[in-house]
Structures are given as structure tokens and as C-alpha cells.
């Protein structure tokens, strides 16, 4: 039976609330077991919380360098001007209230043999099981002329917070008639629909305040997530495909940005075309966060292979890798995927510490994109292990995508669903 959108929201909402749907065992009070979680983003915070909820006797330590976490999801609304940066900032007091030890330090090494996590501050944390949620590392040097230092002028804004604010200010400072270049990388990367939602939000701001301006997307890929839905929205809102289009899309490997000159504010594509811009939003290629590389958890492509039933590393036993860093195709690298994977890993960790076989999990994802205040679209899916447990597959006839010809009331409702989802997931993760 195909789920309609209302039923899917109900189903996924219930899954967020009900720990048992992800196979958690009943409460078990073990003796002095320790779990160290490295990384306090959506995946890591979720895993830490749900391990502690499932078995309060487990000593859970979360190691995260930042005292506040800014969600990438809904950060594009900050760039578009309809949301304040503070609204996507979240702290860790909620996790502390559950009895989790939160250590604000950077993990610098993991010894899988001695079962130790080392930090920049010189501390060592022993563990029985370790969960690594390192997020992504941006590979700046894949683009000639780009670097972490250059990102202060040529923001990626693919890690929310300061970078989000930089990009927003540049748009505010730009004169009417200016050009904004957005350059997404080739897949895989964090939040596949993100660059196109960003283009929409930038166009929304420019249409209202700087209507002579233009957004140019220089895309490494030929296709993108929710492409038909985005294209329809761009046509309706921003004149896409017309002579007066506010958004231009240049697809394919030849359009990939390979060189940037921050002084001249110029980018060059693989084909050799040059584009001068007033604002350059350059999103570089990505790989698993640095600690995953240091710990030897990555493959040659820079991502972390895992057992999809437990998210235990295929390289180092006793270490589970979740979120953007892990290989969990066809699940996208998204906040909701990280939350879902955090719960699956938590259930597996608790079971394994009891000497039990973890249950068979299911996984959820929904990605909302807001093109304008009353124009939202989404894609949703339920996933499960395949027959032999070697890979993740989509459950047939589950989830769905916003119809291309959806009426206005549906598009407006999607925005409200997005806000409700956001409030629920941040409470579920950090509350």
C-alpha cells in the first residue's frame, strides 16, 4: 500500500517518538560499561541520548569541540533572510540533563586495540564501544585557488554558523544588478537538495530587494534531487527558463568549477568558461570528517564503510560510524538520516554490550526544501536491509515526493510540515 504524505508524516513522527520501532532492547543495567561518542552533531547527539535512554547504567561521554551546534537544515532560510541565525543554534544542556558527560574538546586519535579516544587537551577516554559521527571535511584543494582561509571571502556555508552569516551579509551588501554564483560539487556530498534550496532562497531575497540581480548555478552534475519539483518552482517563482530568469542552471562536468580567483571574483569551469560574480558560494568536494581519516575508518574514496545493520565499522570492530561520514546508500547524507542512523547504532550498541544480537532495523529520511515562504517541497522514504543484509534498500511504495503539479495549499502545507519536523527533530536530538 502506498503511503500518502499525511500517513508518512504520522509514521515517521511515531518513529521519532517510539524508541522500540528501531529495535531497542528493554532496559538492561550493565556493570560499568562505557561508550564514547565522537562528534556532537545530529547523529552523535542522537546516539548518545538514545544509548543513555535505553540503558542509564552505561557511562556515555560525548566529545565535541563546539559549545553550540548550528543545524545545516533550515540554514538556507537564514541566508534568504526569513530566519535568524540564533534560531538554528542548539546547546548540550539537554544531553547533560540525561546524565551524559559532554566534553568540549577535539578528538585527535582513536586506538581501536586499546579502546581509547585521545583529545587535543591531552585527555584519554576508554570505551567498550565507540560511536564516531565526524560529519564532513571539505576538500578545498580540489579547486585551484580555494582554501579554508579563502572561504572567509568565498564562503561555502556548508557548515552552518559563521559561514552562514558571512554569505548572508555578502548578499545584503551586494548592489542591485549583481551576480551570485553557487557551485555544488559532484556527489556524494552533504544534503543533496541543499544547493538548489539555497539558490531558491537567494533568488527569493533578490527578487524582493535586488530584482535586477541573478543567480547562476555552476553544477558538477547533470541531475539533482527533486529536480522536477525545483524546476517547476523556479518557473513559477523566478522565471526559470525565460529571458528574464533570476536563476540560471549550467549542468554537467564541463560546468564544474575547477579554479577560483578571489581577488578578481572570478571562477573558471572545467570547460574553460569564466564567470565573474559579486558573491561566490563555492561548495567544495567532501569526505568523512578528519578524525575518521586519522582513525583509519575510511576507504580510498574518503568515506566509511559499515555494517548497515549496526553501523559498526567494516575496518575496525567496536567502532560505529554514523551520519554524513558513513556509506549508507541509498540514504542521503542528511540530518534526518543521521538521526535515524544514530538510533539504529544506539540500539545495536546497547544490545552488543549485553551480548545480544541486535534486531533488524528500519531507517527513515525526509528532506524538506523551502523555495519561498509559502512554497515547500519534500522527498521521503523508509528503508530496510536487503534480503542478505549486505545493503540498504528502499521499502517499495513507501514515502514519496511532492507532486510536480501540487496545488498552492499543498506547497504551503509542506512549509509548515518542514517547520514542525525541525522543531521535533532538534528536540528529539538535543532535548
UniProtKB/Swiss-Prot annotation:
UniProt KW keywords: Disulfide bond, FAD, Flavoprotein, Oxidoreductase, Periplasm, Redox-active center, Signal
Listed GO MF terms: flavin adenine dinucleotide binding; sulfide dehydrogenase activity
A Pfam family of this chain: FCSD-flav_bind
Disulfide bond annotation, renumbered to this chain: 191-367
Superkingdom in the source lineage: Bacteria
Family matches, as PROSITE patterns: TAT
Subunit details: Dimer of one cytochrome and one flavoprotein.
Miscellaneous notes: The active site is a redox-active disulfide bond.
Protein name (record): Sulfide dehydrogenase [flavocytochrome c] flavoprotein chain
Source species: Allochromatium vinosum (strain ATCC 17899 / DSM 180 / NBRC 103801 / NCIMB 10441 / D)
Amino acid at each position: 500500500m502506498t503511503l500518502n504524505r499525511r500517513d508518512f508524516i504520522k509514521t515517521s513522527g511515531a518513529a521519532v517518538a517510539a524508541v522500540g520501532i528501531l529495535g531497542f532492547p528493554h532496559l538492561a543495567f550493565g556493570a560499568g560499561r562505557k561508550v564514547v561518542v565522537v562528534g556532537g552533531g545530529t547523529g552523535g547527539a542522537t546516539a548518545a541520548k538514545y544509548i543513555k535512554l535505553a540503558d542509564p547504567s552505561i557511562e556515555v561521554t560525548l566529545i565535541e569541540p563546539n559549545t553550540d551546534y548550528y543545524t545545516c537544515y533550515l540554514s538556507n532560510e537564514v541566508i534568504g533572510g526569513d530566519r535568524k541565525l540564533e534560531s538554528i543554534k542548539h546547546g548540550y544542556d539537554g544531553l547533560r540533563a540525561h546524565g551524559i558527560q559532554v566534553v568540549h574538546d577535539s578528538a585527535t586519535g582513536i586506538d581501536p586495540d586499546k579502546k581509547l579516544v585521545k583529545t587535543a587537551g591531552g585527555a584519554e577516554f576508554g570505551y567498550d564501544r565507540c560511536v564516531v559521527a565526524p560529519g564532513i571535511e571539505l576538500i578545498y584543494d580540489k579547486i585551484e585557488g580555494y582554501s579554508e582561509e579563502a572561504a572567509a571571502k568565498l564562503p561555502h556555508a556548508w557548515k552552518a554558523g559563521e559561514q552562514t552569516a558571512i554569505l548572508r551579509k555578502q548578499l545584503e551588501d551586494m548592489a542591485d544588478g549583481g551576480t551570485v554564483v553557487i557551485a555544488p560539487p559532484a556527489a556524494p556530498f552533504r544534503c543533496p537538495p541543499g544547493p538548489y534550496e539555497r539558490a531558491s532562497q537567494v533568488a527569493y531575497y533578490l527578487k524582493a530587494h535586488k530584482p535586477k540581480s541573478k543567480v547562476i548555478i555552476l553544477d558538477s552534475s547533470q541531475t539533482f534531487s527533486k529536480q522536477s519539483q525545483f524546476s517547476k518552482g523556479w518557473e513559477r517563482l523566478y522565471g526559470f527558463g525565460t529571458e528574464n530568469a533570476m536563476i540560471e542552471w549550467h549542468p554537467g562536468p564541463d560546468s564544474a568549477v575547477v579554479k577560483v580567483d578571489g581577488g578578481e571574483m572570478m571562477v573558471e569551469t572545467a570547460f574553460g568558461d569564466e564567470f565573474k560574480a559579486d558573491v561566490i558560494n563555492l561548495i567544495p568536494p567532501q569526505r568523512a570528517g578528519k578524525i575518521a581519516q586519522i582513525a583509519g575508518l575510511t576507504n580510498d574514496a574518503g568515506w566509511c564503510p559499515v555494517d548497515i545493520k549496526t553501523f559498526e565499522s567494516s575496518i575496525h570492530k567496536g567502532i560505529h560510524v554514523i551520519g554524513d561520514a558513513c556509506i549508507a546508500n541509498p540514504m542521503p547524507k542528511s540530518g534526518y538520516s543521521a538521526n535515524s542512523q544514530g538510533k539504529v547504532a544506539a540500539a545495536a550498541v546497547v544490545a552488543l554490550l549485553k551480548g545480544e544480537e541486535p534486531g533488524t532495523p528500519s531507517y527513515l529520511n525526509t528532506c524538506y526544501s523551502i523555495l519561498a515562504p509559502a512554497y515547500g517541497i519534500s522527498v521521503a522514504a523508509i528503508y530496510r536491509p536487503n534480503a542478505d543484509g549486505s545493503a540498504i534498500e528502499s521499502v517499495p511504495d513507501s514515502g514519496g515526493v511532492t507532486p510536480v503539479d501540487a496545488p498552492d495549499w499543498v506547497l504551503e502545507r509542506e512549509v509548515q510540515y518542514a517547520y514542525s519536523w525541525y522543531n521535533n527533530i532538534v528536540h528529539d536530538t538535543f532535548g
